[in-house]
Amino acid sequence: MISVVISTYNGEKYIVQQLLSIVQQTIIPNEVVIVDDCSTDNTFSIIENFIEKHNGINWKLFRNDINLGWKKNFINAISKAEGDIIFTCDQDDVWNKQKIEIM
């Protein structure tokens, strides 16, 4: 099972491009775990809207009650993943379409 884990914080400017690069992979992950670290912009609602339009993946979306910072938020997100193989990515990454396949 392949999981992708994303930690977000105020990433409204880039998050859609990152999510598109995940759903366009030649090998689709079994799940995508996204944990938002108390964004004060529209990141969370943008992700919710994206998920509604792209339901072919098992999405797991969470929002922290308090800001943990990037390192603790990634640890938190990884703990929620169920995959044997876990890819981590930042909210402003854009993946090559064959990233999962090549890895």
Q: PLM ranges: what are they?
A:
Residues 1-103:
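Nucleotide-sugar donor-binding/catalytic module of glycosyltransferases
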